[in-house]
C-alpha cells in the first residue's frame, strides 16, 4: 500500500466523522478521555458488527468470559489514530498473506485476545495533552486475574512480534516492539511498519508484497466507487469473521481447561490440524497426554543399575516439540475428512525440516526464488546423481510420480557422467521430466529418516545391553525370580523367566515392547507373571488385556489359575451388560486390578471407546497383536486412543506379509518415537517380499534396516531354541489327485472364467475368481452343478405342498434356490418331505479327491492311536466333512465362528479329557487362536489359507508346551489347481520371517540375542 491510498482512506474516514450527528453523547461524558479508552475502543472495533446480532446464549457466554461489551456507534468517540480505516488495511494484509503462505495463526483475527470487563490495558503511549489525566476511576480485578491478563498480553505481544519478524526480517526486535506498543491492533502495526520501513524485508517477499500492493491499488480504486450497500456487506463479512474468531477462541479456552500445561498457541495449532473440531482435537491430545510420563531410553539415564525417576512434567520447549511431532500427524485412515494430494514441494520440505525432528534430514536443498530456475546444492546433486546411477528399478519406482516404465527408461539412459548430462538426457525422452530429478530428494530424505531411526534404536539397544552387562559384571544379577504372587504349585520355565526379566528391563527404561515368542511358548503366562511382578513393585493397576473373543475364557482361566491375587473384571457381554459394567466402573462399585475384554467390545461403540479413553490405565496388553498390523485401519486408530501409559503386544507372528506390518506394530507400542515418521516408514517398507534369489541389494538392506530398528523393542524366540525337550514337528504335503468328475468340473470352470477375463465380461463370478477356483478344488458341492434349473423348478412347485410354503410364490422360491450350492440344496431336501427324493447320493457327496485321501489317512491314524485336529477355511466344508466322519463312524466335536463363546471352553475341555473322541473339527479363523489342544498330535489342514501364518497358528494348537508326542502336520493340496500356486506364495511369505529372525554371518546373533543371552547368563541359565 502506498502513501496516496492511505491518505485517501484517512480522508474518507474524516468525511464520515464530520457528517456524523453531533447530538450523540460522547464517551468522555461517562469516563475521562484518555489514550487508554481510545486504545480499548480501537481494540474491539473489529468485532462490533458480530456482537450486535449475537443471540442471548452467546451474550451469556461472553459475560462468563468477562469480555467488554461494545458501545454503539453513536456513542463512540472519534479516534485520532492515523490508522483508523482497518478494513482496507485488512484487505491488504489478507492479500499479502495469501501470496506469502503466511500461517493463519499469524493474522490478527486469531492472535488478538479478549480482555475482561474491568481490566484496562495501555497499548499506546499518551500524548502530551493527555498525560495529565488521572486514572483513579480505573478499577482493577484481584491480583491473580490481573496476572492472567498480563500473561495473555505478553502472549499477544510475542505473537505480534513473531508475525512482524516474518514480514520484516531485516528489522530489529526493538524497532518492531515500538510499533506494537504504539498501536492497538496487528493490522495497525503492519500498516505503520509499511509506512516506516517500506513494503517488506527483501528477497522473494519484497517482490510478492510489491505485486500485492499493485493489486491492492486496483482494489482500492474499485472500493472508492462501491455503493454504500456493498460496504454494508463488507461490514457484515467483517462481523462474521470476528464472530468466527470469537467461537474459535472459546474452543481454545475450553480445550485449555482440559490441558492447562499447553500454551494457547499450541492448542490453536492442534485445532487447526483438526479443522477446529473440538472432539477430534480432544481425542488426539488425550492419546498423547500420557506420553509425557513415559520417556525413551535414549532420554533416561542409568547409573549403577538404579532407576532414575521419570520426569513427569516436560518443559514447555519439550512439549512444543512433542506437539509438533505427534499432534500434527494426521491419521492415515478414514478419519481424514479431506485427503489432499501429496505433491512434493521443495520449499515446504525445507521449512518443515526446521521443526520436524522426524523428517529433518539436514536438508540442504536451497531454492532461489529470485529466478525461475531451481538451484540445488552440490551435496544433494551428488546424492541424486548417484541414486539415479546405481538404483534398481524397484528403488526408482519409489520416486514420486515414477512408474515402472519410467524407471525402465531411466536405467536405459545410463550412465550419467555429470549433472548437466543427467538433465540433457532426461529432457530428451518422452515421459521423463526434470521433476523426477527433483523428486529424488524425497526418497533420499526418507532413507535419511530410516537411518536416523536405526541410529536411535541402536543407541537404545546398546544402553540396554550395557545395563545388563554391568549388572552381570557386578554380581548383582538381574534375576527376577518368579513373583511370590504366582501360584506356588506352578513354576515358570527357564525361558519364561528370561521373558519376564526382559519385560521388567524394558519397563524400567520406559520402553514398550512386543513379546513375539513363537506360538505355544506361553506368552500368556509370561504376561500374567509380569503383571504379578508389577503388583509386587507397587503398581496395582488398573491394567487392560484386550484379546480375541475365542480366547477370553482361556485368559480368565489362566489369570485365576496363575495369579488368583489379581482382581479381574471381565468387560464382555451384550450392550446392556456392558452398560451396567461401565456404570459400576464410573461409580467405583467394582474393585479390580485387571480388565479383560475383546477387541470388538473395546471399540464397538462410542461408549466403549469413551470408557477406555477416560480410564487411566497403567498397562494395556494386546493378545494376538498381529491384528494391529494395518496402521490405516479403523480398528488400529480406535485402539490407539486407549489411555494407557504403557503398551505390550503379544504375537506369535510379528511378520506376515511385509515389513510395513511390523513397523505398524512398532508405531503402536512406541508412538512417541515412530509417529512422526509414519509416512517415510510406509513408503520405505510397503513393497512386497520376493524370493531370496530375486531380492536386490536394496531389498536385503531394507530387511537389515528393519532388523536394526526393531531390535530393542521385540523379543522373539522359537521352539527349537528354548524347548530342547519339546517333541519335533513334521510337515507333510499331501498332493491329492482330483476325482474324474471333479477334474472335469474344475476345467470347465477354469475355461469359463478365463474366457470371461479375455472378453472383459463383467459378471458376478468375476468378483472373486480365486475363491470360485478354490471352492471347486476342495469339493464340487460348494458350487451348484447337479441341481439344474429344471430340477429347481420342479422342486419349487413341490414346495407349495409344504404347510410352511402353501401360499408362497413358486417363482420366488426358484430364485432363492438358484443362489444356493449343491450341498445347501441337499440339506434343504432332507428338511422337507415333498422334495426328499431329490437328495444327492452318498457317492456324489464323497466324490472329492481330498475326501478319498482323507479317508485313508484317518483310517491309518486311528489304528495307530493318534488323535486329529482337522481345520478348514469354510464352514460349509465343515458341514460336508461331518457327513464324511459320520459315514466312516468317527467320533468328533466341532467348533467354528457360530459356536457360543461360553460353549467353546467346554468343548475344548471335553476333547482334552475324553480320549475316545477321534477328531476335532475347527474353522481356521475361530479355532486357530489361543486354544490348547495338546491332547491331539496330528493336525490336518483340509484347505490352506492365503496367509500362511493363520495356518501356523492352527498348527501350534497342538505343537506347544505340554505336548508329549511327535506332531504331524498334513496339508491337503489338490493337484493341478490354484492351491499349488497358493502354496508357493505362502512359502515366499514364510521366507521373510526367516530373513528377519535367522542369524546372519556378520551378526552376533538374532534380533534380541545379545540382550536375551546376557539375561540368561546373569540368571545362571
From Swiss-Prot:
DEGH box (motif): residue ranges: 623-626
UniProt record similarity statement: Belongs to the SNF2/RAD54 helicase family.
Descriptive protein name: SWI/SNF-related matrix-associated actin-dependent regulator of chromatin subfamily A containing DEAD/H box 1
Domain Helicase ATP-binding, residue spans: 504-672
Region: Disordered, residue numbers: 1-82, 124-151, 201-246, 329-366
Motif Nuclear localization signal in this chain: 716-733
Keywords annotated in UniProt: Acetylation, ATP-binding, Chromatin regulator, Chromosome, DNA damage, DNA repair, DNA-binding, Helicase, Hydrolase, Isopeptide bond, Nucleotide-binding, Nucleus, Phosphoprotein, Repeat, Ubl conjugation
Sequence positions bearing N-acetylmethionine: 1
EC number(s) reported in the record: 3.6.4.12
Modification type Phosphoserine: residues: 57, 79, 124, 127, 132, 144-145, 151, 210, 213, 235, 238, 298
Positions bearing Phosphothreonine: 54
Cross-link (Glycyl lysine isopeptide (Lys-Gly) (interchain with G-Cter in SUMO2)): 77, 330, 466, 719, 991
Oligomer status and interactors: Binds to DNA preferentially in the vicinity of transcriptional start sites. Interacts with MSH2 and TRIM28. Part of a complex composed of TRIM28, HDAC1, HDAC2 and EHMT2. Interacts with PCNA.
Domain Helicase C-terminal positions: 853-1005
An annotated GO cellular component: nuclear replication fork
Protein task: DNA helicase that possesses intrinsic ATP-dependent nucleosome-remodeling activity and is both required for DNA repair and heterochromatin organization. Promotes DNA end resection of double-strand breaks (DSBs) following DNA damage: probably acts by weakening histone DNA interactions in nucleosomes flanking DSBs. Required for the restoration of heterochromatin organization after replication. Acts at replication sites to facilitate the maintenance of heterochromatin by directing H3 and H4 histones deacetylation, H3 'Lys-9' trimethylation (H3K9me3) and restoration of silencing.
MF annotations from Gene Ontology: ATP binding; ATP hydrolysis activity; ATP-dependent chromatin remodeler activity; DNA binding; helicase activity; ubiquitin binding
Residue ranges occupied by any CUE domain in the UniProt entry: 156-198, 247-290
Reaction equation(s) it catalyzes: ATP + H2O = ADP + phosphate + H(+)
Motif (DEAD box): 1000-1003
SUPFAM superfamilies associated with the record: P-loop containing nucleoside triphosphate hydrolases
Biological process per Gene Ontology, one example term: chromosome separation
Record organism: Mus musculus (Mouse)
Enzyme class: hydrolase
Compositional bias annotation for Low complexity: 22-39
Annotated knockout phenotype: Deficient mice have reduced viability and show growth retardation, skeletal dysplasia and impaired fertility.
Positions that bind ATP: 516-524, 892-899
Amino acid at each position: 500500500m502506498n502513501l496516496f491510498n492511505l491518505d485517501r482512506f484517512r480522508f474518507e474516514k474524516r468525511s464520515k466523522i464530520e457528517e456524523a450527528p453531533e447530538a450523540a453523547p460522547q464517551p468522555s461524558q461517562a469516563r475521562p478521555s484518555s489514550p487508554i479508552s481510545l486504545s480499548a475502543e480501537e481494540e474491539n472495533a473489529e468485532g462490533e458488527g458480530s456482537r450486535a446480532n449475537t443471540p442471548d446464549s452467546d451474550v451469556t457466554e461472553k459475560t462468563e468470559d468477562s469480555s467488554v461489551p461494545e458501545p454503539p456507534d453513536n456513542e463512540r468517540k472519534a479516534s485520532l489514530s492515523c490508522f483508523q480505516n482497518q478494513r482496507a488495511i485488512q484487505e491488504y494484509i489478507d492479500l499479502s498473506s495469501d501470496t506469502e503462505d503466511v500461517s493463519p495463526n499469524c493474522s490478527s483475527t486469531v492472535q488478538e485476545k479478549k480482555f475482561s470487563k474491568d481490566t484496562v490495558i495501555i497499548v499506546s503511549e499518551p500524548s502530551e495533552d493527555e498525560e495529565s489525566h488521572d486514572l483513579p476511576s480505573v478499577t482493577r480485578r484481584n491480583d491473580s486475574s490481573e496476572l492472567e491478563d498480563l500473561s495473555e498480553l505478553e502472549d499477544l505481544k510475542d505473537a505480534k512480534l513473531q508475525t512482524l519478524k516474518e514480514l520484516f526480517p531485516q528489522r530489529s526486535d526493538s524497532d518492531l516492539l515500538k510499533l506494537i506498543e504504539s498501536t492497538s491492533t496487528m493490522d495497525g502495526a503492519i500498516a505503520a511498519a509499511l509506512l516506516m520501513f517500506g513494503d517488506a524485508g527483501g528477497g522473494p517477499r519484497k517482490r510478492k508484497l510489491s505485486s500485492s500492493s499493485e493489486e491492492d491499488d486496483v482494489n482500492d480504486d474499485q472500493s472508492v466507487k462501491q455503493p454504500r450497500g456493498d460496504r454494508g456487506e463488507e461490514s457484515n463479512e467483517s462481523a462474521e469473521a470476528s464472530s468466527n474468531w470469537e467461537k474459535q477462541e472459546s474452543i481454545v479456552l475450553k480445550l485449555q481447561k482440559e490441558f492447562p500445561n499447553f500454551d494457547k498457541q499450541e492448542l490453536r495449532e492442534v485445532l487447526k490440524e483438526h479443522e477446529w473440531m473440538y472432539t477430534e482435537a480432544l481425542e488426539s491430545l488425550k492419546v498423547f497426554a500420557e506420553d509425557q510420563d513415559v520417556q525413551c531410553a535414549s532420554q533416561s539415564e542409568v547409573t549403577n543399575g538404579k532407576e532414575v525417576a521419570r520426569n513427569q512434567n516436560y518443559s514447555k520447549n519439550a512439549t512444543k516439540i512433542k506437539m509438533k511431532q505427534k499432534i500434527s500427524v494426521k491419521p492415515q485412515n478414514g478419519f481424514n475428512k479431506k485427503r489432499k494430494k501429496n505433491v512434493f514441494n521443495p520449499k515446504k520440505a525445507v521449512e518443515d525440516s526446521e521443526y520436524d525432528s522426524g523428517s529433518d534430514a539436514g536438508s540442504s536443498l536451497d531454492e532461489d526464488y529470485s529466478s525461475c530456475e531451481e538451484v540445488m546444492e552440490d551435496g544433494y546433486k551428488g546424492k541424486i546423481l548417484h541414486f539415479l546411477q546405481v538404483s534398481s528399478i524397484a528403488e526408482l519406482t519409489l520416486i514420486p510420480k515414477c512408474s515402472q516404465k519410467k524407471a525402465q527408461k531411466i536405467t536405459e539412459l545410463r550412465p550419467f557422467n555429470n549433472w548437466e548430462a543427467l538433465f540433457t538426457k532426461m529432457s530428451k525422452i518422452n515421459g521423463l521430466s526434470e521433476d523426477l530429478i527433483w523428486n529424488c530428494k524425497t526418497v533420499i530424505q526418507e532413507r535419511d529418516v530410516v537411518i536416523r531411526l536405526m541410529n536411535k534404536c541402536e543407541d537404545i539397544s546398546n544402553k540396554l545391553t550395557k545395563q545388563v552387562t554391568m549388572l552381570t559384571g557386578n554380581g548383582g544379577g538381574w534375576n527376577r525370580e518368579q513373583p511370590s504372587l504366582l501360584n506356588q504349585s506352578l513354576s515358570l520355565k527357564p525361558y519364561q523367566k528370561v521373558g519376564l526379566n526382559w519385560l521388567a528391563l524394558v519397563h524400567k527404561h520406559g520402553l514398550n515392547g512386543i513379546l513375539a515368542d513363537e506360538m505355544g511358548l506361553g506368552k500368556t503366562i509370561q504376561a500374567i507373571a509380569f503383571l504379578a511382578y508389577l503388583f509386587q513393585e507397587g503398581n496395582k493397576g488398573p491394567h487392560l488385556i484386550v484379546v480375541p473373543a475365542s480366547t477370553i475364557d482361556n485368559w480368565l482361566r489362566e489369570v485365576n489359575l496363575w495369579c488368583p491375587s489379581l482382581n479381574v473384571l471381565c468387560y464382555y457381554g451384550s450392550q446392556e451388560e456392558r452398560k451396567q459394567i461401565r456404570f459400576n466402573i464410573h461409580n467405583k462399585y467394582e474393585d479390580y486390578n485387571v480388565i479383560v475384554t475383546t477387541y470388538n467390545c473395546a471399540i464397538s461403540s462410542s461408549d466403549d471407546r469413551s470408557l477406555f479413553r477416560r480410564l487411566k490405565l497403567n498397562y494395556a496388553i494386546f493378545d494376538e497383536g498381529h491384528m494391529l498390523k494395518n496402521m490405516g485401519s479403523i480398528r488400529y486408530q480406535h485402539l490407539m486412543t486407549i489411555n494407557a501409559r504403557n503398551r505390550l503386544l503379544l504375537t506369535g507372528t510379528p511378520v506376515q506379509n511385509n515389513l510395513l506390518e511390523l513397523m505398524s506394530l512398532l508405531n503402536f507400542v512406541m508412538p512417541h518415537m515412530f509417529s512422526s515418521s509414519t509416512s517415510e516408514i510406509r513408503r520405505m517398507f510397503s513393497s512386497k517380499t520376493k524370493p531370496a534369489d530375486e531380492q536386490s541389494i536394496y531389498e536385503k538392506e531394507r530387511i537389515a534396516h528393519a532388523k536394526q530398528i526393531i531390535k530393542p523393542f521385540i523379543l522373539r524366540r522359537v521352539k527349537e531354541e528354548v524347548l530342547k525337550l519339546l517333541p519335533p514337528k513334521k510337515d507333510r504335503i499331501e498332493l491329492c489327485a482330483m476325482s474324474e468328475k471333479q477334474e472335469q468340473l474344475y476345467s470347465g470352470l477354469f475355461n469359463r472364467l478365463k474366457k470371461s477375463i479375455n472378453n472383459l465380461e463383467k459378471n458376478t463370478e468375476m468378483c472373486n475368481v480365486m475363491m470360485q477356483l478354490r471352492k471347486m478344488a476342495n469339493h464340487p458341492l460348494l458350487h451348484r452343478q447337479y441341481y439344474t434349473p429344471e430340477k429347481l423348478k420342479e422342486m419349487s412347485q413341490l414346495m407349495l405342498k409344504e404347510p410352511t410354503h402353501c401360499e408362497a410364490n413358486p417363482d420366488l422360491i426358484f430364485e432363492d434356490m438358484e443362489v444356493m450350492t449343491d450341498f445347501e440344496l441337499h440339506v434343504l431336501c432332507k428338511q422337507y418331505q415333498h422334495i426328499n427324493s431329490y437328495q444327492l447320493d452318498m457317492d456324489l457327496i464323497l466324490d472329492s479327491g481330498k475326501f478319498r485321501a482323507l479317508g485313508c489317512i484317518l483310517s491309518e491314524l486311528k489304528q495307530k492311536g493318534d488323535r486329529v485336529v482337522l481345520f478348514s477355511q469354510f464352514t460349509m466344508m465343515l458341514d460336508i466333512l461331518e457327513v464324511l466322519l459320520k459315514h466312516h463312524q468317527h467320533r468328533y466335536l466341532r467348533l467354528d465362528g457360530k459356536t457360543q463363546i461360553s460353549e467353546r471352553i467346554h468343548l475344548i475341555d471335553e476333547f482334552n479329557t475324553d480320549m475316545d473322541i477321534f477328531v476335532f473339527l475347527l474353522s481356521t479363523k475361530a479355532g486357530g487362536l489361543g486354544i490348547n489342544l495338546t491332547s491331539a498330535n496330528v493336525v490336518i489342514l483340509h484347505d490352506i489359507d492365503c496367509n500362511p501364518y493363520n495356518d501356523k497358528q492352527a498348527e501350534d494348537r497342538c505343537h506347544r508346551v505340554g505336548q508329549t508326542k511327535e506332531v504331524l502336520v498334513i496339508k491337503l493340496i489338490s493337484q493341478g489347481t490354484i492351491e499349488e500356486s497358493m502354496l508357493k506364495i505362502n512359502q515366499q511369505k514364510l521366507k521373510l520371517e526367516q530373513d528377519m529372525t535367522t542369524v546372519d554371518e556378520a551378526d552376533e546373533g538374532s534380533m534380541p540375542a545379545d540382550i536375551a543371552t546376557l539375561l540368561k547368563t546373569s540368571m545362571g541359565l
